Amino acid sequence: SGGFDFSFLPQPPQEKHDGGRYYLGPGPMGLMGPRGPPGASGAPGPQGFQGPAGEPGEPGQTGPAGARGPAGPPGKAGGVVGPQGARGFPGTPGLPGFKGIRGHNGLDGLKGQPGAPGVKGEPGAPGENGTPGQTGARGLPGERGRVGAPGPAGARGSDGSVGPVGPAGPIGSAGPPGFPGAPGPKGELGPVGSTGPSGPAGPRGEQGLPGVSGPVGPPGNPGANGLTGAKGAAGLPGVAGAPGLPGPRARGLVGEPGPAGSKGESGGEPGSAGPQGPPGSSGEEGKRGPSGESGSTGPTGPPGLRGGPGSRAGVIGPAGARGASGPAGVRGRPGEPGLMGARGLPGSPGNVGPAGKEGPVGLPGIDGRPGPIGPAGARGEAGNIGFPGPKGPAGDPGKAGEKGAGNRGAPGPDGNNGAQGPPGLQGVQGGKGEQGPAGPPGFQGLPGPAGTTGEAGKPGERGIPGEFGLPGPAGPRGERGPPGESGAVGPSGAIGSRGPSGPPGPDGNKGEPGVVGAPGGSGGLPGERGAAGIPGGKGEKGETGLRGEVGTTGRDGARGAPGAVGAPGPAGATGDRGEAGAAGPAGPAGPRGSPGERGEVGPAGPNGFAGPAGAAGQPGAKGERGTKGPKGENGIVGPTGPVGSAGPAGPNGPAGPAGSRGDGGPPGATGFPGAAGRTGPPGPSGITGPPGPPGAAGKEGLRGPRGDQGPVGRGETGAGGPPGFTGEKGPSGEPGTAGPPGTAGPQGLLGAPGILGLPGSRGERGLPGVAGAVGEPGPLGIGPPGARGGRDGNPGSDGPPGRDGLPGHKGYAGNGPVGAAGAPGPHGVGPAGKHGNRGEPGPVGSVGPVGALGPRGPSGPQGIRGDKGEPGDKGPRGLPGLKGHNGLQGLPGLAGHHGDQGAPGPVGPAGPRGPAGPSGPAGKDGRTGHPGAVGPAGIRGSQGSQGPSGPPGPPGPPGPPGASGGGYDFGYEGDFYRA
């Protein structure tokens, strides 16, 4: 309590008071002693009160952006369009559809949230022109005009006290105008009075000349996408001949290639592309597979013209009839090896046919060199399958015969489908098309007639206000443009009758106390009204003077002539908007001004604040409800046909003239959703885009029905894999005749993509590939011929799959004709035989003539698997083998990225005007327009009628002192008065 705080000194270990503080009296401070030893810690003091909350901290800095998360699952269709998701990993791109023609713009609505990009659909059918809407209700009256110049100052009254207001006398005749008086002293400007309530609206003036159009305002905010038109009818897609399943291996060796066939004509028009699914998650990269086959190279068609984006995706039309396959074209250059796709589903193993009887042993070669192969013995009857006997001793390897040089045999009948082959090369992805507007979810009703939006008018100069003409139909709401410049002052109109009094202004500053006036005499003669002087500024309010005695009421003076109109004063501040008065009668329309030149488009400014909603217009006539079309039934999903080669893209038609944009019609009622239209004819395929990264392996989908067998195609020979283990020799088939080529089945409708399954386990190894040609002769064996070993065992079951070898050298394309596909042979049933012992490789004999290809014999029972032989030395690479069977249909790949946006195509012909859509909500107030040019002076307005008298205003400030009246001064109680 008034002492010093010694809490900073070390304290002895005694009880603390007041949280360790000691307060001394006001005595003098002693010298500081030596520092003592530190005391023991005291008991903890009581807990202090909680302090006030601290000031809020500064906002933290924005942290670094997190790593990009994985792509989310695809959203459900429908609902409000959401933001565009991150771009997924590209999948295998489908054939791009032909871009539709862009429809007309709909009415501008509120901008929706951007949604997931919809699939690009086919062009909608152009709608019909709508009827113009009814005239909207008359708009509210405009804002009040600016405050006029102040009127002339009144003459100074006498110094007498204010008497009661007498009755108004008759208005005398106006005298001659007096000379203007000398200007009074300029007072200080008082504060601006608040605007009072507005009086009733006066009669409308005559319509002024229209102002000159100002420059075009900035473009408005983009409206929502208009309603999409109904789908066009779908044409029948053309068919392309697809490669059929190849025939089984021929027993004979490959002969000399025949002459190249002429290039066949391409099939029909390609079918339209189905809708693209949502992007899936990225999958693991599959193993690198052998090279796919390169198709026949067709002539490069001219690049098609790009169409505008369609409004919505079309449904896939029914498959067209299969076109006849053209003759095989010249083989193209070998393609680059593609990435190996996911392993396909294992094919059902073929049934093994019964073992044939052994043929006679060939003649031994001369001098150990390979001799010619003897003629094939007649095929014996198939015997019953016996149980495998005991394993005999391994015989010496026989000598291989020389390679024959006979003609190539006719292709045999098709065998069973093998396991799925590796996917072929992916084409180059085409350029990204223009993104069409996101379609609304689901089918929408029949769109109303689309009003054409007029150009934004140029803001005119403010002319002399004329009378209101009949209101026209409400135009689209534009953005507020920049404020226009004030118009030139028009000629002064005739002085109208006195209007109602304005609201009372604020009190002026208080002035000095005035001198008390002497009692006035009774009934002085009224002086003439002087001419109006130049209006002076508003003086400060003086001090309230002593109230004089009430004088007798003077007579009304004669009304003076109206003074000269003073110079216009500065414009007052714009008052608040008054209440709307009653609408006056419509005046005659003034002459229409010449349209101004269109100004340059100004830069887009920020959005203005929303203004008050205008009066609701009359509802437009409700459009007639269209007849609901029958709902189409889904067709039966046909078997998946082979993919045809893409035809050349046709050129787009010439661009038609752009239609004019009409006025916006009234909002039409939303109709019921119409039936889905038929799919339009498919357009030519675009250029295939570059391959995307491989997608993840999907779940195994349901196996689709097997398609009809197509004609045999001949592709490039794939790269040879590593040599597998040699199986035992199977029985030779009986020679048969080549079957007729099978007929191509119709192309099935494209089914919906199946749900991607989890990656399945690795399936069994597929059927063995075609055997390669005989290699170069090996070293000659030494020794006498050994005894013949046991008979060849039945084919064993496949071993585990070997590792993929490096891609081998591609064979060169042959030029022989393609044989016709044979009819599939019957499936044999039986177990597989076991593997026999692998013999030592003998010398290679000369090749004998190729025998005729026999029909496929019935499969024998599968024998017991034999012991695995020792792998022999790797021989030189053989000739390219025959093409294997087409594999099973692979699972659909993930959807690929959209490519980069391509160059915009030429504008197509404008379609007919569609029906008007429903009116969107009112947009925000536009930005203030650019200042327009000064318009011509308007027509002089008519003189208005006298309005009702307003409330009396407050007393004005005291005027300047008047001229002396010839009185005399006298004193009264210390004050001087003048009589």
UniProtKB/Swiss-Prot annotation:
GO cellular component labels: extracellular matrix; extracellular space
PTM info: Prolines at the third position of the tripeptide repeating unit (G-X-Y) are hydroxylated in some or all of the chains.
Transport found in the keyword field: no
Skewed-composition ranges (Pro residues): 949-961
Glycosylation (residues): K99
GO biological process terms, semicolon-separated: extracellular matrix organization
Annotated stretches, region: Disordered: 1-979
Keywords linked to the UniProt accession: Extracellular matrix, Glycoprotein, Hydroxylation, Secreted
Positions with biased composition (Gly residues): 427-436, 517-527, 659-668, 710-724, 778-788
Keyword Glycoprotein recorded: yes
Basic and acidic residues bias spans: 622-631, 865-876
Compositional bias (Low complexity): 24-70, 147-176, 222-263, 272-282, 312-331, 363-382, 483-500, 550-594, 601-621, 639-649, 669-679, 725-759, 767-777, 840-855
Quaternary structure annotation from Swiss-Prot or TrEMBL: Trimers of one alpha 2(I) and two alpha 1(I) chains. Interacts (via C-terminus) with TMEM131 (via PapD-L domain); the interaction is direct and is involved in assembly and TRAPPIII ER-to-Golgi transport complex-dependent secretion of collagen.
Purpose of the protein: Type I collagen is a member of group I collagen (fibrillar forming collagen).
Name of this protein: Collagen alpha-2(I) chain
